[in-house]
Amino acid sequence: MESPTGLGTAGDVLHAAGQLFSARGFAATSTHAIAQAAGIRQASLYHYFASKNEILLRLLTGTVSPSVETARTLLATQAPASARLWALCAWDARLLVEDRFNVGSLYLQPEVDDDYFAEFHALRRELREAYARLIIDAAGARAAVLTDLVLGLVESVILLRRRDPGGVDAQTPGLVADGALRLVFVTEQESSAAHRRGAELLISLPHADRSDVRIL
């Protein structure tokens, strides 16, 4: 049978699960419902995923691992910290904005506190540490508080999408990144330069594509 999404059976399952988890919640969604939405038998689902938890883990890590990869690259890049921070904020916000089913809204599901999701939490910690390092370099002291503020701003797009699905667009990530620089006391003049240089950094990322220009 042809894949409904063109992503293969595993991709079909993730696509269906993302939609159902976001609409109904994790606990209220059965593997039977996921399989039915993916166009396969429930027994076939277990050839690709051992459990519903594994499906959720794949979805959650997919919202973080690309940003972690970007953060690693930016930390090793020779450029002003403010520009690298802008680039990371814009990339991270874009990933959350463009996620089809707003999977980031599942971060606070109580099931995610389980040890099974340690890989996801480890990625989140690494991403937070990358933000903290860039903020220290860009703003000096007060890194702990500022890191939480910046991450809160970036991830606010999750709630914005939930409240008003049409309230975010291709310009939102750049606006979020601009706002993050103001939170860490970057001056208006330096912020403009950081925006320009950060946009250049995004386009030059090895795993970027030309569509990144949409957030500039």
Where are these regions (language model features)?
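N-terminal intrinsically disordered/low-complexity leader segments
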Residues: 1-8, 190-216
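Helix-turn-helix
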Residues: 12, 16, 20-58
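Hydrophobic alpha-helical connector segments
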Residues: 58, 69-98
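A short secondary-structure junction motif
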Residues: 66-70, 96-99, 103, 134, ...
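Amphipathic alpha-helical packing segments from all-alpha helical-bundle domains
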Residues: 68, 113-151, 171-174, 178
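Amphipathic alpha-helical segments used for helix-helix packing
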Residues: 84, 93-118, 147-152, 159, ...
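Hydrophobic alpha-helical segments that form the core
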Residues: 94, 141-184, 194-205
